[in-house]
Structure formats: C-alpha cells, structure tokens
C-alpha cells in the first residue's frame, strides 16, 4: 500500500488543467461526500456501533499509536468493526509479523500479532470483521487470488501473548490488484475498494469490487466470485493519479463510504470520503 509521505504536503505546484469529475460505480450512485483529512482520515474508516450509538473511526498517518510506532509499526491500514469491536491493522518494514490493535466494546485495548506464513506477503492492507464477529478477513498488496481469514482477536482468540494464527482463505475466482479495503455486506458478500492503476483486470482503474462467497468464512477455505461495479468516484481540482483507500458499509441505511485521495497538492484540499448507495 502506497504510504502518505509528509513530503507530499509540501509539493508546490500541480497541473489543474483538466479536473476529473465524479463517475458512478455501476449499481452504486454517489449521494454526497465529505472532505478527508490526509493525516488522520487517509487510510480508511469503520462504523462502530455501541449502546445504540454509531461513530465513524478513521485511520491515517496521524492516528498511528506512538507506542506502536516506536516499535516499528509504521503503517496502519483500513480498520474494521463488528459487534462493538474495533480493529486496526498494522504492518512494519520487516517480515516479522502483522499486528491487530483491538478495542473491545468497553474501550479496553489489546494488541495481537500474527506471524507470517512462509508464502504470505507482509502487507496488512485492511481488516474486515465477519457479521458474527468470529472471524477477521484481511488482505495483502499486489496482484492476489486470495483473501486471508484469521480468528477474530479479542473474541475467538483472547490471549494477546499467543500467535494469532492463519485459519483459512477466500480463494478468488479471478485475481484482484491492490485491494485497499473490504467490508462485509452480508455473511456471504463483501465490497472491496481496489487501487488498481492499470485497469487490465476489470476494464477500469480503481474499481469497486464485490466478492460473493460460497459459504460464510470459517476455519475451512471458501471460494469467492469477484465482480466489478465499475470505477469509484474520482473528482478533484487537480489532474493526476488518484488513490482509492478503505471502505465501510453502514448497515443502518445501506450507505457505502470510500476514501479517495486527490492528486498532488489537492491531496490536502479536496480528498474525499464518498457516500454511495445502490442506484
């Protein structure tokens, strides 16, 4: 996952001759947007429901826990939430492990580490909590034909000192590229944002993907059928390369939120969290 460098905030100029306008992902229509701050709202978001109240928690460079940063955990991905639990995925530059910072419904926190399998990429792009809050789906960077499934830390695994083990995988029927975030829509369906810059896999860059599962995730592999809903909204006063980030599906009203970072200096001024609903 491409990181937000602080140097990007000091870029002096960028071409704004042909500002792209928002497009609609097929089947999903933009209904509004909010400015996404690049320091603390640039990696993703999760809707956390507790005691009948829903709050939106964002991640970015500025939300990295300082205590974890000094230990080398220098990147945070798209968070996930379910049943009052909130999970932040962390990665570091070595291949030692991945870390999941879990906040329980009572506000207590614990850190769980997952030792990499021999074949596993070190990237920790996102965390998606299954509807029953028993499993955690997570993803790697690059071109992949799988998503990974772990026991839900804090629920199915309650010892932070023990390794959070690999449980199973979602075997995709076609490859995906640079998936930045996923969230469950139902027990057998996820929506995912792809930052694919090439467009060769689904006929467009930056697609919104749907993954339909053969069965709910668990300790056995399941298959996932991937379809594209087209390109996510790209709109900025600047032209250049956008970066799609994490997603959240709000079950209350069926709103999908996705963070899209603008090119160049517009990263600061008009990056957005888009709100989409089924058209």
Describe the residue ranges of each PLM region:
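Secretory targeting and sorting signals
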Residues: 1-24
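Beta-strand-rich domains and repeat architectures in extracellular enzymes and scaffolds
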Residues: 32-61, 70-78
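Surface loop/turn motifs at the tips and blade-to-blade linkers of beta-strand repeat domains
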Residues: 33-40, 68-72, 114-121, 170-175, ...
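Conserved beta-strand position repeated once per blade in WD40 beta-propeller domains
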Residues: 42-47, 76-78, 126, 179-181, ...
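Structural motif
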Residues: 55, 63-67, 94-102, 143-153, ...
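Blade-loop segments of beta-propeller domains
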Residues: 62-97, 111-117
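Loop/turn-rich, solvent-exposed surfaces of beta-rich toroidal or solenoidal domains
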Residues: 174-225
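Conserved blade-ending motifs and adjacent loop-strand segments that build the rim/top face
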Residues: 219-251
């Amino acid at each position: 996952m491409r990181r937000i460098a602080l140097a990007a905030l000091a870029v002096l100029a960028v071409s704004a001759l042909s500002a792209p306008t928002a497009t609609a992902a097929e089947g999903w229509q933009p209904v509004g947007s909010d400015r996404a701050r690049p320091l603390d709202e640039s990696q993703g978001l999760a809707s956390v429901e507790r005691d009948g109240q829903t709050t939106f928690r964002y991640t970015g460079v500025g939300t990295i826990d300082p205590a974890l940063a000094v230990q080398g955990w220098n990147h945070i991905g798209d968070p996930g939430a379910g049943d009052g639990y909130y999970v932040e995925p962390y990665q570091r530059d070595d291949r030692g492990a991945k870390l999941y910072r879990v906040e329980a419904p009572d506000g207590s926190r614990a850190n769980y580490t997952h030792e990499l399998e021999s074949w596993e990429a070190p990237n920790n792009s996102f965390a998606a909590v299954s509807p029953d809050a028993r499993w955690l789906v997570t993803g790697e960077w690059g071109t992949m034909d799988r998503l990974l499934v772990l026991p839900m830390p804090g629920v199915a695994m309650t010892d932070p000192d023990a390794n959070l083990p690999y449980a199973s995988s979602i075997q995709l029927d076609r490859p995906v590229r640079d998936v930045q975030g996923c969230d469950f829509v139902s027990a057998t369906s996820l929506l995912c944002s792809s930052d694919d810059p090439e467009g060769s896999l689904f006929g467009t860059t930056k697609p919104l993907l749907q993954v339909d599962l053969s069965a709910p995730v668990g300790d056995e592999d399941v298959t996932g059928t991937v379809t594209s809903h087209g390109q996510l909204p790209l709109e900025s006063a600047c032209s250049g390369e956008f970066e799609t980030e994490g997603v959240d599906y709000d079950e209350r009203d069926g709103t999908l939120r996705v963070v899209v970072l603008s090119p160049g200096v517009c990263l600061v001024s008009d990056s957005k969290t888009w709100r989409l609903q089924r058209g």
